Amino acid sequence: MTYTRNHDPNFFEECQSFANCGSFAFNVEEWYSPDEYFEDDMGQTIEQWIDRCVWNGWDVYDMSNEFAGILVNYILNDFDDVRYLIWEGEIQPDEELIAFRTFVDTEGDWDFHFKVFRDGLWLEKCGSDPVRFCEENDWNNGLIEYIIQTIYFARKLES
């Protein structure tokens, strides 16, 4: 899928319901879900994949990590101007830092979340809620705690 890049600095204030954390992080106008076309290496849906993981005795942490690894590949395929970082210190002056975590539980629920480091501040957009300030290391939204280690991306800023 091709995503429409946003060029309006007020877009995320005016069009809150059309954008989520992924839209905000990657600066696209569409609701961005890296799991939208999920298919693992065995051709399974997310639900089938979770069932297989639970059947094999995986815990929440292992499932969340594996899920993140699968989604990282989707993200890198979706955006040519995004790269995976080994650590956040690799960020270049012409890039924006994006933090990412996932959550999967044994009941079949899953989620992902992105945060953006912009103008010296961490920002996030939770679903259709407005963009807000956040802490880099606070990954508990009251319903879900994203327990895995943070994955970082760099997105090339538009000139």
Walk through the language-model features, giving the residues of each.
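Short amphipathic alpha-helical surface micro-motifs
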Residues: 4-5, 80-82, 131-135
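Active-site nucleophilic cysteine motif
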Residues: 13-32, 39, 43-45, 64-68, ...
